[in-house]
Amino acid sequence: IRLQDGQVEQHWVTSGQLMQLVQTANNRTLLMATVDGRILWWPTQQNAPLLSLMHLADSGFLVVDQRGFYDSNRPGDIPAVSWVMADEPRKALPLEAFMRDFYQPGLFGRLLAGEILQLPTTLSDLNRVPPKVDIVSVETQSNGKARITVKVEDVQGASAHSGAEDVRVFRNGQLVGFYPENDGDAL
């Protein structure tokens, strides 16, 4: 709305109630605080928010863009956040189920810098059947490190099977290792 004459210049729609709305000094971005605790970062030249920023308990954060890419200081352990797929609307999938394809470290800065992230595939094409994982044993070694033996079993789903394609190890919600090596530090 132009303040000079009250004419509507642009019309935006967002779901949920807003608690506060602030425009940046350069008039290029609206920051919207929502009732559910999100901050929407909405460039005024776009028809949708660029990203949502959420503060989580225990100094956690979550940044999510409109296509599902996310960043967090606890990328695989945010119980209050889940994926709900159109073909299984009553089944909430944990965030880590899509970590390989949608976790993007530094997402906030990358989006603000104008980086355009390419979707790896459509969500409906992703194999969402998790394997069965059991901790078999935990042994403390003489060097103070722990040796953990896990058993991973394939699980058959309606249209796919699970398997173990990427292995990620978390300790207290923090990602501490990857396998295979091309995704990060080898275990």
Which residue stretches match the model-derived regions?
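Short, polar loop/linker segments at the starts of domains and inter-domain junctions
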Residues: 73-76, 144-148
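Long, low-complexity serine/threonine/glycine- and acidic-rich segments characteristic of extracellular
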Residues: 140-144, 151, 156-187
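Eukaryotic protein-protein interaction scaffolds centered on beta-propeller repeats
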Residues: 1, 6-13, 17, 32-137, ...
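Short coil/turn segments that connect the beta-strands within blades of beta-propeller domains
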Residues: 26-28
